[in-house]
Amino acid sequence: MPTIEERDLRHIWHPCAQMKDYEQLPPMVIDHAKGAWLYDVHGKGYLDIVSSWWANLLGHTNEKINARIAAQLDRLEHVIFANFSHRPAIELAERLATLVPEGLTKFHFNDNGSSAVEAALKMAFQYCQQTGRTGKTRFMCLSEGYHGETIGALSVGSMDLFAEMYKPMMMDNIHIEAPDCYRCPYGETRDTCTCACFEHAEHAFAAHGHETAAMIVEPLLQGSAGMRIYPEEYLRKLRALCDAHDVLLIADEIATGFGRTGRLFACERAGITPDLMCLSKGLTGGYMPMSITVVKEKIYDAFYADWSEGKAFMHSHTYAGNPLGCSAALAVLDILDEENILERAEETASWLSARMEESFGAHPNVGEIRHIGLIHAVELVEDRAAKRPFDGGRRLGYAIYRCALRHGLLLRPLGDVLYFNPPLNIGRDDLDTAIARMKQSMDEVLGI
């Protein structure tokens, strides 16, 4: 009789992984979960300090979210969303309208983060075509940016790990050198930063603004690049530059939204309103695949016309606006409000920052500890003074990942950047456990 792991390997091709590596881990088959913990079929627990790809916002099997989904399941599980609607979607849009940055008024429902980005790109392009800006056909993005795995989303990303193979298929866009506050080429520090690097954006807009429909950006935090955090002032300057060149600004809040950066949305920290905003991951508490592209009224108005004019936005997904996902999202908003989650998370973040500094601040291979909200990242380097990274071929982060799994901690390093991105309501005992197990794993792999 084959084991459950052997049955998995026989048929399943897992995402974002080299299956030969996966075979050697060995595979972990999760049976159940509670709070920040996952438990495999053998009863072993794993502390999910990365919120299962940054999606689990309020803990696994949260009782309030469970109850809301269960109640909806007995009424309506799904319905076509083209020319039909339902209460959960209407209520969710109404609630979000009071929470998103001022000026964002219309909500287009999609299936997942990549599809929200695809919708935003198509909306921006079509908006320009339908408002007399027909020469604006390209997009701008930041180097090291990540916006999803579909072809359009890859085209506005800049990470070769995901995109190199598919470049012949991709759109030709303008990639702007992103801020790198740890290894600032201008010799500035986070405390002295004047955003000198913004000159790259200014040059790009001067050369290409006339042909650019939209600029897409992960506000304040480039997640997949290694939890790279950049200044709020950079985002404010980018908003002004887009306005000056009649370029739409798309904020990809898929990873940063719903409290991850200490505010409900990262754009709030900079006090800006994008023209389009993409939401997913924490939107449903990590329960259901759902996303929303939120836009300003002027975007919506450019599509509103008689059918004969051919201006409708014909982008659709089968499970757009799914009632179960909308119900989960409504429960998330209730919990955030009723349990003062953001305020409590801010207190936890301050405590965690001190604990991370205490535990890793003097480590000879820790180049920088950076954080925004509850997200904390530790960048490992071979030479701390020179900020020289380890040879990528060593796969140090992956080795620590494997070691941590043996100790019951789920990390998912970004290269040699180890990070915490836990549920917002995680307890301090769990965070202490995560710190201890991460340090143990680092020291074992580094031979300290």
Question: Model-predicted segments: where are they?
Answer:
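Conserved N-terminal phosphate-binding loop of PLP-dependent enzymes in the Aspartate aminotransferase
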Residues: M1-I448
